[in-house]
């Protein structure tokens, strides 16, 4: 990321093979350039998610009952999330803004193009494996040409995506146990609330009986 940021103009593209390009783009949003919420709130959500993942990873390592592959995949997702978070936190403070006309360069810390949490994420990999054309009868996209796989992404995006997909495929047991654990804690919480409510109502009944007598 540092090399691309300081050696490529924004939008510059280098062809490696017919199906592999290095394209320098920046985005404010999530993996693969998606964006649904404002930059600040996205960074805040990322921070909370990273803290939660660190806590969870420490917990499952300490428990010592989970498979190594599951621990590795959780760590892989965490590493990817931290990688993109570093861009958001520090790149705006360390570099000038990228432009199609000149290459960004490093500046004294705090004198960059954006404040803390507002930096843009650097993306660079694109794999346009093949093109296709939608059938004319297909709704909305009929007759249009598309490319698989066209989104520009970075290595951190790959860590998050590969980690999550691999967990869904190879770690279903651990994910089911995680879901059952949440359900049990929810049941315990509702049960304790019910018991406290029953105790409160029985206490009130006893007080009323004592007053009547």
Regions found by a protein language model. Give the residues of each.
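Alpha-helical transmembrane bundles and membrane-interface segments of multipass inner-membrane proteins
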Residues: 1-213
